[in-house]
Amino acid sequence: MTEDVKADVPKKLSIQRRTKTTVSGTTTSGKSKAVQVEVRKKRTVKTDIAQQEEAKLKAQQEAEAKKIAEQKAAEEKARLEAEKAATKKEADEKSKAEKAKAETAKPAKSAVDSKAKFVDPEKEKRKAEEAELRRKAEEVARQKAEEQARRAAEEAKRYAEADDSDNESSSEDYSDYNLSSRYALEAEDEEDRRNENRGRGKNKVAKAKKGGRDDENSKNSKNERESNRKNQKDAKFGKGKNGKKGAALQQAFTKPAQVVKSDVVIGETITVAELANKMAVKATEIIKMMMKMGEMVTINQVIDQETAQLVAEELGHKVILRNENELEEAVLGDRDVNAEKVTRAPVVTIMGHVDHGKTSLLDYIRKAKVAAGEAGGITQHIGAYHVEMDDGKMITFLDTPGHAAFTSMRARGAKATDIVVLVVAADDGVMPQTIEAIQHAKAAGAPLVVAVNKIDKPEANPDRVEQELLQHDVISEKFGGDVQFVPVSAKKGTGVDDLLDAILLQSEVLELTAVKDGMASGVVIESYLDKGRGPVATILVQSGTLRKGDIVLCGFEYGRARAMRDENGKEVDEAGPSIPVELLGLSGVPAAGDEATVVRDEKKAREVALYRQGKFREVKLARQQKAKLENMFSNMSEGDVAELNVIVKADVQGSVEAIVQALNELSTNEVKVKVVGSGVGGITETDATLATASNAIIVGFNVRADATARRVIEAENIDLRYYSIIYELLNEIKAAMSGMLEPEFKQEIIGLAEVRDVFRHPKFGAIAGCMVTEGVVKRNNPIRVLRDNVVIFEGELESLRRFKDDVSEVRNGMECGIGVKNYNDVKVGDQIEVFEVVEVKRSI
């Protein structure tokens, strides 16, 4: 239908709508002036044809609707007439039957006249009932027909209105000034505006030269005409303030009746700004809410999970709490650890004071001479070994250093152990590290077995050891306690078998079990960086079986187990519970004490390791920032403090930790040791460059510098020192710190002179005639004047003469004349004390 209308629309006829003429005139001042006048012809639209077509279309639709309604009404009428005819036929049949019955009873009419008269009212009643039924049926049929006709008319009317609206919307685009499309009209108006602007641009210079009020009036009138024309057009198309938008131009979006409350995911910590962004509210709303709760916060302040949850729920949001460690928990939770537990070997840590025989005892047990390689009798790093007994039972030993600097290493060994063997020398008794080992064992909850060593010496006294240990709550079985005391001699092997039996007996009491066939987990005993093999970690397997090729997550590091070696350097393919192995293949050197866990997915293990590194970095930065803020004012008040910068490189991680901790403890209020760098492995060129930049000394503990590092060290004249015993390292660092201390100055009396007489001199004033009673009186040294042993003046000598000669010094027992500078109140009996200032070196 719409296509027909478009076809009937006459084609656009282009006419010249604008004509320009020039009007000449004179101004008020008498000057001639030419004004261009533009005459625009109004657009005419012939709408008769379109209106006729619309009226014709509407009439056709109404006629069709009327025809449909009439057809439906006729059908309903025919149906009603058929029902009426059927009812009438039934009534006629009944009346015929009655009539036939009456004919048969006619011969006896005379006899039954009275009876016939009695039956007539009954017939009349039936007829009346039949008539009433017919009337009701006709009424119902008529109402039904009227209802259907009304519905048909409404349906037809609705169809007609829908067609009208479609025609109006379709014809709207084609009903314009000249029956062209609306889009063509807009394009034409745009072209007109461009032409006008182009004309104005050409005449801009001329207009600027002419100026005057008439030009402004002309421009204003033109702007007004343009504005009026635009307003009329906008009003027609529903644009602008006065325009009414048609149904086709109105937006169908309806504003929601209430604010949508979305779910808010909250991590362990969140800032106020992030919380506001997630809840789609202003941050000021959250700040107001928290002020009502009694908390003063800023927009960038970090709030905890519970507070954020409370605020979000107060504002009507549903909160989803997210655990930031969920990836780590998921990775560590996806492990096969449900296998049956079996009995495992005990892990025994040997502790004790320096040189009490720990390594020698372990050496005898292992039947290997490793103690000869230990420098200075100190175990340099934790060693882990397992030995098999004659009856097939196995014991794993951890050997810890005895020096005071290795406190953290002993603490780690105690945590990973089941039984602590405390080695005490029978001739030396309880020492400081012995007490510390007892404390570590108690903190770890590990039972003690005391090995009283060196009983073969003549001065050995095991009973004294038991008495001394009683003071530290280590009660032997002899005194009613539960601690086994075993006298041994590591040198001769006496009592070693008894010690092993005591260890196995203690392990049976503990009932040690572990999963053997599941995925392995353990603890890092030691770690270091090997130049050829890369990062190496000594891992004590605590449960499960560690196999070659397993993916291991170890603290901040991860990797696949490329190779495993036992304590003898032999390659092994797997290691069960309580077995220590050296593991190769990690991404870096893990920290000693980190948990080592076998996981399924290497990619997820990498993600967990990176997450741990990031979290540790954040905590470290926060701690540093806090320390800076706390120490800012104290550092300002202290002034300059001498600093000794040190770079520490060692063979294993435990030694690095111990040395750094010991160096930090050496710091005093005047000299501080600052460890600018530390690490595991040899000394590299990077370390030398760092030492140059920070003016530090390099300390190598059981490591050496490579060739490139040595060249840089020699060129920059860096102080490089190698050590293999921690005593020497700490003593030399102390000496270096002592050299940085401010020296102390001490006054020493070198001579004493007694005033015997006083002379007056026109040049020097009062001259004291003195006798040197002690030491030497020197001309250039400072002096004090004492009267009745009280200092009344301190200064220097102006002259020192013996007879008439100036001398530099006068010795004991000689007379001299002394002139005191700027002091003339010298009296007989005074004492002149001569002293010198001596620099005294300090040490830490």
Curated annotation (Swiss-Prot):
Cellular compartments annotated: Cytoplasm
Q: Where is the composition biased (Basic and acidic residues)?
A: 1-11, 79-161, 211-237
Supply one GO molecular-function term.
Answer: guanosine tetraphosphate binding
Q: For the region G2, what residue ranges are annotated?
A: 377-381
Keyword Nucleotide-binding assigned to the entry: answer is yes
Q: Where are stretches of biased composition, namely Acidic residues?
A: 162-175
Task: Please list where the region (G3) is annotated.
Answer: 399-402
Region called G1, residue ranges = 352-359
Q: Any one cellular component term from GO for this entry? A: cytosol
Give UniProt keywords alphabetically: Cytoplasm, GTP-binding, Initiation factor, Nucleotide-binding, Protein biosynthesis
Q: Where is the composition biased (Low complexity)?
A: 21-33
Question: InterPro entries annotated for this entry?
Answer: EF-G-like_DII (IPR053905), EFTu-like_2 (IPR004161), IF2_assoc_dom_bac (IPR013575), IF2_II (IPR044145), IF2_N (IPR006847), P-loop_NTPase (IPR027417), Small_GTP-bd (IPR005225), T_Tr_GTP-bd_dom (IPR000795)
Task: Spell out the residue ranges making up region: Disordered.
Answer: 1-35, 79-248
* Chain segments carrying region G5: 489-491
Domain tr-type G residue range list: 343-513
According to its UniProt entry, what is the function of this protein? Answer: One of the essential components for the initiation of protein synthesis. Protects formylmethionyl-tRNA from spontaneous hydrolysis and promotes its binding to the 30S ribosomal subunits. Also involved in the hydrolysis of GTP during the formation of the 70S ribosomal complex.
Please report which protein family the annotation says this sequence is part of: Belongs to the TRAFAC class translation factor GTPase superfamily. Classic translation factor GTPase family. IF-2 subfamily.
What is this protein identified as? Translation initiation factor IF-2
Q: Which organism is the protein's source?
A: Haemophilus influenzae (strain PittGG)
